[in-house]
A protein has these predicted regions:
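N-terminal Sec-pathway targeting helices
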Residues: 2-23
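Extended, compositionally biased low-complexity polar/Lys-Gly-rich tracts
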Residues: 13, 29-41, 157-160, 167, ...
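Short, surface-exposed binding/anchoring microloops in extracellular/periplasmic proteins
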Residues: 83-122
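Short, low-complexity, Pro/Ser/Thr/Gly-rich segments in the mature regions of secreted, periplasmic
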Residues: 175-195
Length: 195
């Protein structure tokens, strides 16, 4: 009898854990929808924009917020990671690299499951800069089934374009003003002088 009772208890515990896990699995997208994504997702999204060895040219060193040199464990160096909530479920992450032409914008949605299939591939983004009224249309692939991020879209700002105030992003026919700051050119020499 004792063994049977233990088995029943184990089965009950397993069922309870499965129920709790299931509730969290389905509730989590709604929680993120209202609270915004957890901080670790920014780092992961920023890291996944790396596309070559030039990301590593600062050898894992970057200036932190207070201007001190910071040894980073990750290979990818970003001076800045800023998140901007455009509307519920739609976020813009700015990843700034080690020079002004390494600014990436990551537009991603975190809608609950019913709306998570949105694919930015079908959208045309118009990016309007403050200098020379630059108007760049871009399309890019996205990953609509990624559970933690929903669909997301990477945009690298064109290198000649120095943006120092706002750009206008048009998506789904709706214009969204985005504040973008240029990053100072932080080359390896500059880091060496400071160090």
């Amino acid at each position: 009898r004792g063994m049977k009772g233990k088995k029943k208890n184990v089965i009950k515990v397993i069922i309870v854990l499965l129920v709790i896990g299931g509730i969290f699995y389905f509730a989590q997208p709604w929680i993120v929808y209202y609270t915004g994504p957890p901080r670790w997702t920014y780092e992961r999204l920023c890291q996944s924009v790396q596309s070559g060895s030039y990301w590593n040219s600062a050898r894992g060193r970057a200036l932190d917020v207070d201007g001190h040199l910071d040894e980073l464990k990750t290979e990818t160096v970003f001076l800045n990671k800023k998140i901007q909530k455009l509307e519920n479920g739609l976020y813009l992450l700015q990843c700034d690299g080690i020079s002004e032409w390494q600014t990436w914008l990551v537009l991603f949605n975190r809608y609950p499951i019913s709306d998570a299939k949105r694919d930015f591939l079908l959208d045309t983004m118009k990016l309007k800069g403050s200098d020379d009224n630059v108007n760049v249309e871009m399309k890019s692939s996205s990953y609509p089934d990624e559970r933690f991020f929903g669909a997301y879209l990477y945009v690298v700002l064109p290198s000649p374009m120095q943006i120092d105030d706002t750009i206008t992003l048009e998506i789904d026919g709706k214009e969204i003003d985005i504040e973008v700051e240029t990053v100072p050119d932080v080359s390896e020499n500059y880091l060496r002088k400071q160090g």
